[in-house]
Amino acid sequence: MSPVASGMETLRGWGMVCHARSRVYRPRSDEEVVEALAHVRSAGLTVAHRGSGLSYGDAALNQGGAVILSEGLDRIVELDAEEGWIRVQAGVTVETLWKAVLPHGWWPPVVPGTMKVTIGGAVAMNIHGKNQFVKGSIGEHVTGLSVVRSDGSLERLGVDRERGAVRAVVGAQGLNGTITEVTLRLQKVHSGYLDVLSWSTPSLRATLDVLEERAPSSDYAVAWIDCFPSGRGAGRGLLHFAHYLPPDHPRAGRAMEVVDQQLPGSILGLLPRSQAWRALRPFTNDPGMRLVNLGRVVSGRPRHGRSYAQTHAAFHFLLDYVPGWQRVYRPHGLVQYQLFVPREAARDAFGEALRLQRVTGVRSYLGVVKRHRPDDFAASYSPDGFSLALDFPVRPGRLAALRRLCRSYDDLLRDVGGALYAAKDAVGVGRLPLDRDPLFSSNLVRRWEAGCREEA
């Protein structure tokens, strides 16, 4: 066995629905990645890639095959604090990155809702954040990559010389090579605070209208929606728009140290964050979540139109407020279906998505809407439009209804020319990269391939 292999292990998707048993490799250098791939080839296996294991479904699982974990590739290689760029190994997390650059007046150009994801995983999935509509996905800010191909060759790619090759790797799920290093342009910031505007809306149409109207003048924008009401109240929401502070702002230069950005250690000063998921468990049912969503609507109304200061970490990393919050969905887990649809179809498509929940009796406990702009990556999922992310509990008595709902969403996306996002998917049928190398595979790849054959 290869010295970087640790034997067979059972790995799970973050949503706790998918799992697989695989031969696991933990390389710590480019050379050990080359060694791991050689061992995989000689064993006649396929291989998937896994960073922090935060893909909701089966994108980082490979039943009966191999998985390369990037946890040992965790070094910051180079930081240019004057020019604003950083080179890191693939296993460096967003948390490690922002803590390294914020004291120098920089911030990662794109971050998801958790700081625990790895940069290699972020690039492989081409993650987006609350600023996709203005800054694009993370791939827009990648200036260089180191990639080990299936034959063991190491390629160092730069956008100045190999733009097409870089953009083919970004978002390809690691299906055309193993990413070992990433170079990123950083975002200049003058304060550790953002100026955040809160907005309340009475309906889905109003939510989308306000998001479209206010996003262009904002640096970040996101909307939470209530999926439980029927009629005109369906899709009512709370929106947040955030802006960077200028260098002459009274808060410029403040909260630039890591300690200033720490999330609170407790909820309301009473319940430790690490135990907060336990307090939510009694509400993890339809009546409880209807009440939770209503409470959020009511509590948000007095803040309508008000602005306040919030640290970057507090604004961006909502999923880290309650560590391990997915455990509220034990023992069966959750799935997320995220619909990306063109702008002109969004109002009708999202309205239909909520209607289908009422028809099937399967309600989303969390709905999040974002504005997007298109990109030109080979594995693009982002339109000039909107996305709607929907979290569903997995219940044994409702599995058939949940499957029907997800198949209806597949049909809906196909009808409007929409797309799926691999990092979140556990149930849909999406498009695979055209230049996929057969050495690289995953449970998601095989599921999508089977779904495409069924549709053909």
Label every model-predicted segment.
Residues 57-77, 129-152, 178-185:
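Structural signature of FAD isoalloxazine-binding scaffolds in flavoprotein oxidoreductases
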Residues 32-35, 96, 205-207, 345-351, ...:
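Short, conserved charged micro-motifs
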Residues 401, 412-456:
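Activity-critical C-terminal alpha-helical subdomain
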